[in-house]
Amino acid sequence: MNHLTGLSRLSADSITGLLDTAAGFKQTLRSPNASFSPTLKNRRIALVFFENSTRTRFSFEIAARNLGAGTLGFSAASSSVSKGETLSDTIKNLEAMQVDAFVLRHPSSGSAKLISRITPKPVINAGDGSNEHPTQALLDMFTLREHFGSLKGLKVTIIGDVLHSRVARSNIYGLLRAGAEVGLCGPVTLIPPDAEKLGVRLFTDLDRAIAWADTAIVLRLQLERASGTYLPSLEEYSRHYGLTDERLERTGKHLLVLHPGPINREIEISNHVADRIQPPGYSKSMLLEQVTNGIAIRMAVLETLLGGTP
């Protein structure tokens, strides 16, 4: 594996290898005075983010530093991009500064793949438009595997704005390859028209989707995109597709709940469901555990792509 631009073509063995490597890092992270071998000492990793990020950017920075690498921050507004420099030229110039790897977030779908074709340095996709977000899916899969023991045969329902979600796409590819069953639930206007061709189940009724599933990944309703013809109103969306205690109690199902963040509270998920990490209740939130697991997964990705002698 030279790059990680998506999960659509990543083999099941490669996915398992990354999850296994992350498990080793997670075990060390649990230690009070966790320390790691500086396998990436003297490596420089450019965090090239053209969109805002909290969890992904900071966890990549922590992951890199845990392994001894240095990171270079990047802001499009304060770079030559604001003067018209292209993405390709930006990458080529950073490469000339002896950068060893690129972590790229960009609003254009396919941008990570494009960059991987013009540089021999590893490119890690931290989210490209509505295309993919592979490390988020890997940390979701890692979280589920840690809880259930295996992904094979696990029924995972992905709820909400699937149409615009790069997280959903990467999760669909990765979960299916790992042997899980995947269901998609949301308004017809927010489900990709070709979704069934991917081998997933489709639900428009959230109660039925919950009753079928072992766990749910709730997606952020992308308010900047999902408006107008996609949704009549936020109130109607929340009434039909918001995950609440009342809905879970009605189905009688105890559900493990994931969300990639950031959360639109009381729209796609209630405060109680988002914050409940202990019983009693009909759900258990894994949201903060996902954030913790993101460090281990991103360490595994960096180690896999860059480990060894420079």
UniProtKB/Swiss-Prot annotation:
Matches recorded under Gene3D superfamilies: Aspartate/ornithine carbamoyltransferase
Q: Does the keyword Transferase apply?
A: yes
Q: Look up keyword ATP-binding and say if it applies.
A: no
Annotated residues that bind L-aspartate are located at 83, 166, 220
Record key words, sorted: Pyrimidine biosynthesis, Transferase
An example Pfam family from this entry, by short name, is OTCace_N
Q: What is its EC number?
A: 2.1.3.2
| InterPro entries recorded | Asp/Orn_carbamoyltranf_P-bd, Asp/Orn_carbamoylTrfase, Asp/Orn_carbamoylTrfase_sf, Asp_carbamoyltransf, Asp_carbamoyltransf_Asp/Orn-bd
Q: Under which pathway is this protein filed?
A: Pyrimidine metabolism; UMP biosynthesis via de novo pathway; (S)-dihydroorotate from bicarbonate: step 2/3
BP terms from Gene Ontology: 'de novo' pyrimidine nucleobase biosynthetic process; 'de novo' UMP biosynthetic process; amino acid metabolic process
Q: List the disulfide bonds.
A: none
**GO cellular component annotations of the record:** cytosol
Catalysed reaction(s) here are: carbamoyl phosphate + L-aspartate = N-carbamoyl-L-aspartate + phosphate + H(+)
Which parts of the sequence bind carbamoyl phosphate? 55-56, 105, 133, 136, 261-262
Subunit-structure text: Heterododecamer (2C3:3R2) of six catalytic PyrB chains organized as two trimers (C3), and six regulatory PyrI chains organized as three dimers (R2).
According to its UniProt entry, what is the function of this protein?
Catalyzes the condensation of carbamoyl phosphate and aspartate to form carbamoyl aspartate and inorganic phosphate, the committed step in the de novo pyrimidine nucleotide biosynthesis pathway.
Q: Which family does it belong to?
A: Belongs to the aspartate/ornithine carbamoyltransferase superfamily. ATCase family.
Instruction: Quote the protein name from its UniProt record.
Output: Aspartate carbamoyltransferase catalytic subunit
Species the sequence originates in: Chlorobium phaeovibrioides (strain DSM 265 / 1930) (Prosthecochloris vibrioformis (strain DSM 265))
